[in-house]
């Protein structure tokens, strides 16, 4: 049996505590299900700066490039607020994305039935929500040149950011969207601002052409991004996969995540190009939440987003769909049982710590895997 190579990068703050619960699940996948995961560990973020003077070492970057997949915790904290900009903790994540050439960011928005009341929307609008926002991660206005502030010499300044997309960038992210839709409900909604932006016109043309050329079996609709934001709040369950650029994806994915009322419980994935020989994509999985230094080391952090990130990893990097389904069902089942960490606790539920939540999910996963 071929081994499955995983690099674990716990990072800073609550990252190590959450990753400890993931290790338990991986141990079970190996010992009881014989799935052959090989794990290595490395440093990223502030802890890497403390050890090496940089946010990720070249050696750990090599481990990331050699792995089938990377599981990332969280980085940052006030301890490193004054370090030089180029070695700040967040630079470790940026280097991982850049060197691994991760251009497709997947942000699911899932409403767990037991937490439907946590949303600011009516339960009938949000209950059963399961959508996926696919954001182009390496192009667009965040990376386009020129990017500068110019002194106009008359007491005025001008800030310049440039939105740039090439056809190949649009085509490759569109391919990912259609591939993902086939594994879900077979629908892609592409969002841009073609009415006022030339890059939006090209985006629309590129997605349409790619659909006609390679993916005509998938339903495709186009929507202006501002209208898409409105529809996300009005009736989010109309969507399956939302495909959009870097800027709009940044905005819309946070809107979609908060629909669920549980931003800190959601996972994400960043994927790269498919290998020409194996078809596998480089991938990094991480919780949406930050490092939460204020609660680090207290044993009260919620590990659900980190465990859900492992479920995404099983699904998208290793094709272990049944195992991913069971792990996600285990999370939902524990929530149905009223087990809560402090961040999602309410009257009438059972408050537990990080370890207890991880143990409960693992026990449920074991029962579902029997």
Swiss-Prot record:
One Pfam family of this chain: Iso_dh
Positions bound to Mg(2+): 226, 250, 254
Record: residues binding NAD(+): 77-90, 290-302
Subcellular localization, as worded in the UniProt entry: Cytoplasm
GO annotation (BP), single: L-leucine biosynthetic process
UniProt keyword Manganese, yes or no: yes
Single GO molecular function: NAD binding
Keywords linked to the UniProt accession: Amino-acid biosynthesis, Branched-chain amino acid biosynthesis, Cytoplasm, Leucine biosynthesis, Magnesium, Manganese, Metal-binding, NAD, Oxidoreductase
Family membership: Belongs to the isocitrate and isopropylmalate dehydrogenases family. LeuB type 1 subfamily.
Listed PANTHER family: 3-ISOPROPYLMALATE DEHYDROGENASE
Subunit structure and binding partners: Homodimer.
Protein name according to UniProt: 3-isopropylmalate dehydrogenase
Source species of the chain: Brucella abortus (strain 2308)
């Amino acid at each position: 049996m071929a081994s499955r190579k995983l690099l674990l990068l716990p990072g800073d703050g609550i990252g190590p505590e959450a990753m400890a619960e993931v290790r338990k699940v991986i141990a079970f996948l190996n010992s009881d299900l014989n799935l052959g995961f090989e794990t290595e560990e490395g440093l990223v973020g502030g802890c890497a700066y403390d050890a090496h003077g940089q946010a990720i070492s070249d050696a750990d970057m090599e481990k990331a490039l050699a792995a089938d997949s990377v599981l990332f915790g969280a980085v940052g904290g006030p301890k490193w607020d004054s370090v030089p900009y180029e070695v700040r903790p967040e630079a470790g994540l940026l280097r991982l994305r850049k060197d691994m050439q991760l251009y497709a960011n997947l942000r699911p928005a899932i409403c767990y039935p037991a937490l439907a009341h946590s949303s600011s929307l009516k339960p009938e609008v949000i209950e059963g929500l399961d959508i996926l926002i696919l954001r182009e991660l390496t192009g667009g206005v965040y990376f386009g040149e020129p990017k500068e502030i110019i002194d106009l010499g008359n007491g005025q300044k001008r800030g310049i950011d440039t939105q740039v997309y090439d056809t190949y960038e649009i085509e490759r992210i569109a391919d990912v969207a259609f591939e993902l839709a086939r594994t879900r409900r077979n629908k892609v909604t592409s969002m841009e601002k073609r009415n006022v932006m030339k890059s939006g016109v090209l985006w629309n043309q590129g997605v349409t052409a790619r659909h006609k050329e390679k993916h005509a079996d998938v339903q495709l609709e186009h929507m202006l991004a501002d209208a898409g934001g409105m529809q996300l709040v009005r009736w989010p369950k109309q969507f399956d996969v939302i495909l959009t650029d870097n800027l709009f994806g940044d905005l819309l994915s946070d809107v979609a995540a908060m629909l669920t009322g549980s931003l800190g419980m959601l996972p994400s994935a960043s994927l790269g190009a498919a290998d020409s020989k194996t078809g596998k994509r480089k991938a990094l999985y991480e919780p949406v939440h930050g490092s939460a230094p204020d609660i680090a080391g207290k044993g009260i952090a919620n590990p659900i987003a980190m465990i859900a990130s492992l479920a995404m990893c099983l699904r998208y990097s290793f094709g272990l769909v049944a195992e991913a389904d069971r792990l996600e069902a285990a999370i939902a089942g524990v929530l149905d049982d009223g087990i809560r960490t402090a961040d999602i606790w309410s009257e009438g539920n059972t408050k537990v710590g990080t370890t207890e939540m991880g143990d409960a999910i693992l026990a449920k996963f074991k029962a579902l895997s029997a």
